[in-house]
């Protein structure tokens, strides 16, 4: 059944601000640094554009990372901004790496997931709070398929979309086994262990997969328990991503917040700080990793055998 809901103003706005496919965190880092260098040189966007013979909108779009920057154009900007040769070489190297590092094409083609996945692929560590479902990086194929099928009941999509979505989810999980692997810390509400997606066999395999993942040195799983005096928190799912410094160009932490429209990113330091504090408290109030593994084993044995 095809949805006949009208396109919302928010949908139209999201379409206008979609970055080019292939966008990476390295590219965002480069875009932010180009703006900083221009401002340090005392130039407005219009002035910089006039000096290199471009339109003012091109400078703006590069700095907002709506378009990429060619190496020849980058050299022009760095020369205009008076960047010394050593740092110029580092920024050119960053630009090359940003172009080379990409998700598999099937992931890049699925834009609603791709922007988040690009950030996730370049993150050094991710802190993830999940009150409703098993975190995507730890889902089995059958569990992921069951989750997506429920979503499709509410928001029908084209044929084959569920399988493409599951395939992208599995591609994302490669960050856990790369060298060096992503450092993943998750807090999962205990209700997730009891909430059924698929049949009992799907749930049993999913919880067994969680138990195995919890043994890996780069993965920490904590369960936010139902028992005790802890409140039911009005905090939706979010991921807090931290990135390594590359070529002396830092990138602020990014928070990806989930809602019905997909994921939206927060980069303002005051906003991301609140989510950092929230995750630290969620982790502190949760069971420790050993207790969490025991609870997962109990939920597997008692609920899904």
Predicted feature descriptions by range:
Residues 199-305:
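C-terminal regulatory/effector modules of DNA-binding transcriptional regulators
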């Amino acid at each position: 059944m095809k949805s006949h809901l009208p396109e919302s103003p928010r949908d139209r706005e999201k379409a206008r601000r979609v970055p080019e496919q292939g966008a990476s965190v390295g590219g965002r880092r480069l875009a932010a640094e180009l703006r900083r260098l221009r401002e340090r040189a005392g130039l407005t966007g219009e002035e910089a554009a006039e000096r290199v013979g471009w339109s003012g909108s091109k400078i703006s779009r590069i700095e907002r990372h709506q378009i990429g920057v060619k190496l020849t154009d980058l050299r022009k900007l760095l020369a205009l901004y008076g960047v010394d040769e050593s740092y110029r070489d580092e920024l050119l190297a960053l630009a090359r790496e940003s172009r080379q590092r990409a998700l598999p094409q099937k992931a890049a083609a699925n834009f609603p997931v791709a922007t988040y996945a690009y950030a996730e692929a370049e993150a050094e560590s991710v802190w993830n709070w999940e009150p409703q479902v098993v975190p995507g990086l730890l889902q089995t194929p059958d569990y992921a398929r069951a989750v997506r099928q429920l979503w499709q009941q509410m928001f029908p999509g084209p044929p084959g979309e569920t399988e493409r979505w599951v395939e992208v989810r599995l591609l994302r999980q490669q960050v856990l086994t790369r060298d060096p692997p992503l450092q993943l810390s998750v807090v999962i509400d205990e209700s997730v262990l009891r909430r059924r997606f698929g049949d009992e066999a799907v749930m049993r395999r999913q919880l067994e997969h969680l138990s195995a993942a919890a043994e890996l040195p780069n993965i920490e799983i904590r369960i936010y328990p139902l028992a005790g005096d802890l409140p039911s928190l009005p905090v939706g799912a979010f991921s807090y991503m931290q990135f390594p410094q590359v070529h002396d160009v830092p990138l602020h932490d990014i928070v990806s917040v989930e809602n019905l429209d997909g994921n939206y990113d927060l980069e303002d330091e005051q906003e991301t700080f609140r989510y950092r504090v929230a995750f630290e408290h969620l982790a502190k109030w949760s069971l420790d990793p050993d207790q969490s593994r025991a609870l997962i084993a109990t939920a597997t044995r008692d609920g899904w055998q």
